[in-house]
């Protein structure tokens, strides 16, 4: 039964991870002008929330989007890695998240009207780290709740 439980969780995290990476890298393949139109449309909907940033509001929204995408990635990588027999569970998800951020920025080098940014790599990796911490924190709370009920 334990092996079935393991496979189920591993498969679930792997599917979410693949979808998340497809979303991240798919957005990086979008030409700069189209990407700007998409974020501009989203900004129109949420502009009141970003009014405090003035004319930098759309810039902040784009960076927050990077951070959020990679927070999800860090969460899924950590959950996936937790469901492997590997003993080391900290370094691999963080390094894989950093690699994904570097790949993302590399894709943007070759996308028309886009460019690469070292700052974006750091923003992305910060998101991965938050996702890692959220996954670990949630797992801790669930384990604690489970052991309290026994």
Where are these regions (language model features)?
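Membrane-helix interface segments
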Residues: 8-12, 85-94, 117-118
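"…centered on the first transmembrane helix and the immediately adjacent amphipathic helix/loop
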Residues: 2-75
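Membrane-interfacial alpha-helical segments at the cytosolic side of multi-pass membrane proteins
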Residues: 68-84, 126-142
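Small-polar-interrupted transmembrane alpha-helices in polytopic inner-membrane proteins
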Residues: 17-24, 90-109
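Internal alpha-helical transmembrane segments of multi-pass membrane proteins, especially GPCRs
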Residues: 69, 91, 95, 123-126
